[in-house]
């Protein structure tokens, strides 16, 4: 069996590693570098350049040189982050037919997985050159906070590159592998702070070594998949543009060639300021006007850089606090802090993290290489080459379906260990309903519309019956890659429908963070809404029950009582969709009081029909009601099919 290679597919740089004996080894590429720029360029002669060759020609070919594609993978064109990138990227971001964010090069639209596949191909070739044999299998890393669409798109990129992606593994977890395998003795609680080129993750991981076997259990994870070194670079670029405009009166934002040179200079300045107190950005002939050529010469100090990015560094601590809270650990219980990602080389980031955790981060983990090394270890575990490592990872967000009253009913809670499978029985909301719509959601809010819709599908052919009787079993299955599969089955007919959430219905990072943030900020509002929905559902059930009893009572119900009940019914139905819980409860009580005579008649009729047979029927009905959860499923009309 061939080697399963480990690939860190990064926003700025990528890296490939293998397990050599008992040690993970990073492989140098054809240029002799241990990391490869995640840059792809399309030359005029049709040649596709990847890595350093693409980066070298970027200044003269800005529109056809693609970088930071990971920020687009699995995203919708309308996403706020994509719209923001649209204004600063020198290449064209286009809207695909399915609404995804694609790029346009030389008049041709291309999907992000298609472009990322070019980087993966280079990683594959790098490994093949080193091993002297074909490589067909890989473990690829993704940010822990990547959603279902982004994970699926990453897997697609691997497939396009000719790789069988055996596992998608979270970047902080992979870094913990690189740190913990063969090194940790006993039990350690570790915080992995991963600030890369385009994404930020924090994972709290418990590493437990017993008799040579090491278990890695992710206790909680959080992050921001649109915060990274690229954003730091953009702050520097904007500062340089503003300074140049102030000095020369020329705005460079519309000059793609100048912007590409600025990007290169900003990145270099940022890196230099990690070891120096100041640097000069010197770009001769940056532009020209009627008076002649213009040159840029701007001094940037470390203090200035820190003032430009201070808010982003502070923002990174919010997900850290959330992850700690979700893990049930206090800051003082963290034994080790590991820094991953090139941006963590910035002294301000290191100082901020050290002050937060009250301890210096470890220096024995290479922030650029640890993730690929961990992926290689996972590859060796999957191939059976390494048997003394166990990984227990988690899903970052809750997953569920929309149920009666537009409520999000979670089947799998956030930070649940994966792979996992969970089933729950739901039922119909209307009598004789022949079809239901399963609406899959991702997020932390109670109101369905406040969460992200991942997709929906219909289950048809349900046997006509009273509402609440059909039993629809909904199953959520998250595989080890964190990718979701949903199925619904009518337990009586065994008819089943399945769906794998596709990248076209991806969830944007901003939406994820907004959902979690709002869930915490609006906990009281969520509880109030949940109580309102419960009251509405109770009222709806009462209306249904009373109408049925009126029909069954027939002429036995006096006309005066019937009129009172009909009036109370109308008044309750008029307020049932409103937002005032107290009003609904009052009208509900009024209907109960008006229905006293009706209930007496119903009881008399029930006794007359024979206690024995009715008791059995009642017991059966009660059991069915206990086993199901009312769900809001729309009946699929013929004109919708």
Curated annotation (Swiss-Prot):
- Molecular-function annotations in GO: ATP binding; ATP-dependent protein folding chaperone; unfolded protein binding
Where in this protein does the record put region Disordered?
600-641
The UniProt keyword set, sorted, is: ATP-binding, Chaperone, Nucleotide-binding, Phosphoprotein, Stress response
Name the residue ranges with Acidic residues bias.
627-641
Record's Gene3D superfamilies?
1.20.1270.10, 3.30.420.40, Actin, Chain A, domain 4 (3.90.640.10), Substrate Binding Domain Of DNAk, Chain A, domain 1 (2.60.34.10)
Q: Which residues carry this modification: Phosphothreonine?
A: 199
From start to end residue, where is composition biased (Low complexity)?
A: 602-622
**Induction record:** By stress conditions e.g. heat shock.
Function comment: Acts as a chaperone.
Family assignment from sequence similarity: Belongs to the heat shock protein 70 family.
Q: What name appears for this protein in its UniProt entry?
A: Chaperone protein DnaK
Q: Which organism is it from?
A: Aeromonas salmonicida (strain A449)
């Amino acid at each position: 069996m061939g080697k399963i290679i480990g690939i860190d597919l990064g926003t700025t740089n990528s890296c490939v590693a293998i397990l050599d004996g008992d040690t993970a080894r990073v492989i140098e590429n054809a240029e002799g570098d241990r990391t490869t720029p995640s840059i792809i360029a399309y030359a005029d002669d049709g040649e596709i350049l990847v890595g350093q060759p693409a980066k070298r020609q970027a200044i003269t070919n800005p529109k056809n040189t693609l970088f930071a594609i990971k920020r687009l993978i699995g995203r919708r064109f309308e996403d706020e982050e994509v719209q923001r990138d649209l204004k600063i990227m020198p290449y064209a971001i286009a809207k695909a037919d399915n609404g995804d964010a694609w790029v346009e090069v030389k008049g041709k639209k291309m999907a992000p997985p298609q472009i990322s596949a070019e980087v993966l191909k280079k990683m594959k070739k790098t490994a093949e050159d080193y091993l002297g044999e074909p490589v067909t299998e890989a473990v690829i890393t993704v940010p822990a906070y990547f959603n279902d669409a982004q994970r699926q798109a990453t897997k697609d990129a691997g497939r396009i590159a000719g790789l069988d992606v055996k596992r998608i593994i979270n970047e902080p977890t992979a870094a913990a592998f690189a740190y913990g395998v063969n090194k940790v003795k006993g039990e350690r609680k570790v915080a992995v702070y991963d600030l890369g080129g385009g994404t930020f993750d924090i994972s709290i991981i418990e590493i437990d070594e017993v008799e040579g076997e090491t278990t890695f259990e992710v206790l909680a994870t959080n992050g921001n998949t649109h915060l990274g070194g690229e954003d730091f670079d953009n702050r520097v670029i904007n500062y340089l543009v503003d300074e140049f405009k102030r000095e020369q009166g020329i705005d460079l934002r519309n000059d793609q060639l100048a912007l590409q040179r600025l990007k290169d200079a900003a990145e270099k300045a940022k890196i230099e300021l990690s070891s120096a107190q100041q640097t000069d950005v010197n770009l001769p002939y940056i532009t020209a006007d009627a008076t002649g050529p213009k040159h840029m010469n701007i001094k940037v100090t470390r203090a200035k850089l820190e003032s430009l990015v201070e808010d982003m560094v502070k923002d990174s601590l919010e997900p850290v606090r959330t992850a700690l809270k979700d893990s049930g650990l206090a800051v003082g219980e963290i034994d080790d802090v590991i820094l991953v990602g090139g941006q963590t080389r910035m002294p301000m980031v290191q100082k901020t993290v050290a002050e937060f955790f009250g301890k210096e981060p470890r220096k024995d983990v290479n922030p650029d290489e640890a993730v690929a090394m961990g992926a290689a270890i996972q590859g060796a575990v999957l191939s059976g080459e390494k048997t003394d490592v166990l990984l227990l990872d988690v899903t970052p967000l809750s997953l569920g379906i929309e149920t009666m009253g537009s409520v999000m009913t979670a089947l799998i809670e956030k930070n649940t260990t994966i792979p996992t499978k969970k089933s729950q029985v739901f039922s119909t909301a209307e009598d004789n309903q022949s079809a239901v719509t399963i609406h899959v959601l991702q997020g932390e809010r109670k109101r369905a519309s406040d969460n992200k819709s991942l997709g929906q599908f219909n289950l048809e052919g349900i046997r006509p019956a009273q509402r609440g009787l059909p039993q629809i079993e909904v199953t959520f299955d998250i595989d080890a890659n964190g990718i979701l599969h949903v199925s619904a089955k009518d337990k009586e007919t065994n008819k089943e429908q399945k769906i794998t959430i596709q990248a076209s219905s991806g969830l944007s990072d901003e939406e994820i963070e907004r959902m979690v943030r709002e869930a915490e900020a609006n906990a009281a509002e969520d509880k109030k809404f949940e109580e309102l929905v419960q009251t509405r559902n109770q009222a709806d059930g009462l209306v249904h029950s009373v109408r049925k009893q009126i029909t069954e009572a027939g002429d036995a119900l006096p006309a005066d009582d019937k009129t009172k009940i009909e009036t109370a019914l109308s008044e309750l139905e008029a307020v049932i969709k409103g937002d005032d819980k107290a009003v609904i409860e009052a009208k509900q009580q009024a209907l109960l009081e008006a229905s006293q005579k009706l209930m007496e008649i119903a009881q008399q009729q029930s006794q007359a029909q024979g206690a024995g047979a009715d008791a059995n029927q009642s017991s059966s009905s009660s059991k069915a009601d206990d086993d199901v959860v009312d769900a809001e499923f729309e009946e699929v009309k013929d004109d919708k099919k």
